[in-house]
Amino acid sequence: AELSRKNDILMIADEVTTGIGRTGTFLCSENFNFKPDIICIGKAISAGHYPVAATLFNQKIIDSWNELEKMGQPYSQIHRRGNSLVGTQEGSAISLKVLEILERDNLIDEVNEKGKYAMDKLKEIEQNSNIREIRGKGLLIGIDISNSDLAKNHITPEMRNHGINVLAEGRVIMFNPSYLISREQIDYYVNTLNNILTK
């Protein structure tokens, strides 16, 4: 980030998966004291209820567009881009309501607390020989399993047999539950995973 700033290079953060509270802060980039010039967000902005995405620009970029427009450059020529998930009243209304609920119910603070709780619980089983590493932030955690066959063909179906829908990306079992997950549900997830791994 420092090198980009020094050389006047715009920084872009892809926060489609990590933004809107998923990592325990509003934007994941906040965890790293990183202030991007452009931010792409989606998914959680509507809590998954409606396909919505947005591209956010800092004031410096907007000011430069305004200056170009004052010099006779039409806005449509300055800012040419497309996005298939923007411009709907329904999406905007849902997103505003989601942001209101996140703030009203302190859900991002809860994600941070639940994420720490989940990480502590998962770290208790990390010594299992089938686990290479557990990493993540907030409620975006990856459990790196010793091999992808075990992750996809054994752990994933077994977890589903216990009522837990999981996704394996290669060797990594993803733990990215609803922000409303309870500590009891986290315990059930970890205990079920541990039992499957120790069979």
Ranges and model annotations:
Residues 1-199:
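Conserved N-terminal phosphate-binding loop of PLP-dependent enzymes in the Aspartate aminotransferase
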